[in-house]
Amino acid sequence: MEKSTPYKIDQNLSYFYTLDEKNIFALELKHLLQDEDPFYVALLENDPTNNNTPEADGFYSTANVLGLDTGLDVYELNQNRRVKSNQLDAKLDYYYILNEKSNLNFVGGTILSKQNFDSRFFQVLDSQGTTLDPTPIFGADPLTSNDIEYKFTDLYLGLRYRVKSGIFTFSPGFTAHAFNTNNSQYGTDFFKDTFQKILPEFKMIMQFKRSESLTLDYRQQVNFTDVNQLAKGLVANGYNAFFAGNSDIMNASIHNVSLFYRSYNLYNASNVFARVAYTKTIDQISTDFNFVPGSVVSFRTNLNSPFDNETLTAFGRIGKTFKKIRTSIGGNFTYSKSFQFLQGNVNENLLYNHSYNTSVGTNFTKAPNVRLRYRVSFTDQISGNRDDFNTVTHVPSLNFDAYIWDSLTFKSDFSFNEVKQDGNVTNSFKIWDMTLAYRKNKDAKWEYELIGSNLLGTDSRTTVNAGNISRSINETFILPRFVSLRLRYQL
């Protein structure tokens, strides 16, 4: 019997000190100590008498690809894995107040991280514990064990200036980083990268009123990976799915810009929210998928994409109340461009998604309330080497709740879902839940509640998903019609 004894110790310290009205200090310390030791065991039946014949077991070709001993009645596959992490984050902010409308923020800090990753994939040959370290026939360097130490250091200093002029508040700034990463594998393979980078940032707020503003935000970021993506030896995610890291992986650079508008108006009971954001990722850490011919084995590794990934998102919502009637209308839009690496080939994937929703409902204090909602969503996925994938989803719903005779509460929730893929209905289902609760008065100790779930007896719901390398239809089974009585006593 394998035992797993992981632990995680996360400590945080925050300290604020005001020296005087012009000098303020803020200290933040975080420390993470973590030990993970997941294990993997798979038992697969085998008939060694029909090897190399048309009647061979389905796993036989896969066993050959993995380099296993095929002469046993059972394939017993094991993987031991251990990841130790030790990370310290420390940051000191110093604020110098210039005047009522401007201040300076000096920041300095460090991130010190160390990770150790050890793993071994092997086959158990007999009850005495004899093991075999297989030699797979796929991958550039098919090692079945890992022994890696990864260290990451980030030393940084930054300056931000904040000034207010009229309705504008400007906050330009930058942070200068000195990065150092190095990893050693098997005690012989060393990789080190040291570089410096200045990351600018800018924020502008237009405060039209106390309840209305427009915010523009831009910043650059650097994204690093962790030890799991660097370990070169094979790691089993399943008996036929393996991953090997890349010790030469570099960091990714990210540009983010966003524009956000908000408005509250208490006089005409309305609110407006809108946001547009754009993200561009350079040297994205991507996955290269490979399938071993003649088997069901998939093999993944990673690389820095030579192409830039882009994402554009936008959403908006308007809500207004007319006396006791609440209304809202909104929409979302997403565009993304990514690149898929499969069997050494590159394919561009484009995703367009836009959805719209509206609702109208009542807001009575004593009378029953009803709310009607409707949402429609359109998704288009365009892939260079596959047919386009188009999905339309319609979701109307009706909610009702009433508080009757100061003792009885009635709630009803109904929704209908219809999914169309390439113009054809792939799934439609209805869900209706209801609750009836009785409490004699607000001081009563007893409450009786009758709950009905899935009253229409819907069996399942189906979703159609389009991934980077495959398309899938997933069926989720729903609990059958269920009615229960709940008694609650308040002490």
Predicted regions mapped to residue ranges:
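Primarily recognizes Gram-negative and organellar outer-membrane beta-barrels
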Residues: M1-Q490
